[in-house]
């Protein structure tokens, strides 16, 4: 499987542990805009409603924008690409 697996992601309260939702996984493929979501039937509807909220989208966008700045590994990659 290609991409990153965000296991147990429950977007609204970010304080929840992934272990609280062991059956809900999001697989993100960086090869294209394809998202594969697997979950128990009891989780699918409420989670999809919460994922598709504007609040979650903005929060996710902020996390993805801030994470490279906090990660030395990402900073090194960006610095290397900038020099080349």
Swiss-Prot record:
Origin: domain of life: Eukaryota
Note: Contained within a telomeric X element core sequence.
Similarity remark: Belongs to the UPF0320 family.
Name of protein: Putative UPF0320 protein YNL337W
């Amino acid at each position: 499987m290609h991409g990153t697996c965000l296991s147990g992601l429950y977007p609204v309260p970010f304080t929840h542990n992934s272990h609280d939702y062991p059956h809900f996984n999001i697989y993100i493929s960086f090869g294209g805009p394809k998202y594969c979501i697997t979950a128990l039937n009891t989780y699918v509807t409420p989670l999809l409603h919460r994922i598709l909220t504007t609040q979650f989208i903005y929060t996710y966008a902020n996390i993805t924008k801030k994470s490279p700045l906090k990660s030395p590994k990402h900073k090194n990659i960006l610095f290397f690409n900038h020099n080349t």
